[in-house]
Design a protein with these regions (language model features):
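Contiguous beta-strand/loop segments that form the cofactor/metal-binding neighborhood of enzyme cores
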Residues: 1-144, 148-179
Length: 179
């Protein structure tokens, strides 16, 4: 099968893809245990490099799965949630899942006031899909958006299964593979 990356990658990587306005990565590297001929790895790491997007600078997004935890996570000081997305910035970090968000280190953000909600609460993705089929608007994660996200996830999986150190370089819709 396609493993955790294909199952949950579209949910967890949605957070950075949406917040950072990401599309096609410029390069991808993947690391993990020796590849299995039939299934995706249970433990892996995929590193995506994205170029500048308008006023947004280049950014690196790293997917960690299974025992492949980030070093900063292992050092402590970060809540040990089962799942989540950790945004690391110059002034601190944001740990998020779909139910909660924590600014870190917490002591540095003790007086922080959350900004007002910018977007209305969306209907369920099932309802958005039904409404779109009826011509009542577009879903938040339509194919124009989710195609880039899903393709990036699958490429991370593919690269994790083809060799020890993998780099794929994307150019628009063209993909080049280098060893």
């Amino acid at each position: 099968g396609n493993g955790t990356m294909s199952d949950l990658g579209s949910h967890w990587n949605d957070l950075p893809f949406w917040a950072l306005q990401l599309k096609a990565p410029l390069a991808i590297e993947a690391f993990g245990p020796p590849a299995h001929p039939e299934i995706a790895p249970a433990t892996m790491r995929a590193v995506y490099e994205f170029g500048a997007r308008g006023d947004l600078p280049p950014v690196r997004v790293t997917w960690h799965q299974g025992d492949e935890r980030p070093e900063i996570w292992k050092q402590g000081g970060i809540p040990q949630w089962r799942d989540g997305a950790l945004f690391i910035g110059k002034k601190g970090m944001l740990l998020s899942d779909y139910g909660k968000h924590v600014l870190l280190p917490e002591k540095d953000f003790a007086g922080f006031t959350r900004p007002p909600q910018k977007f209305p609460k969306a209907a369920s993705h099932h309802q958005e899909w039904i409404d779109a089929c009826k011509g009542k608007g577009r879903p938040l994660a339509d194919f124009e958006y989710s195609g880039w996200l899903t393709e990036s996830n699958h490429l991370g999986n593919v690269l994790a299964t083809v060799s020890d150190k993998k780099i794929a370089v994307m150019s628009g819709v063209n993909l080049s593979y280098y060893r």
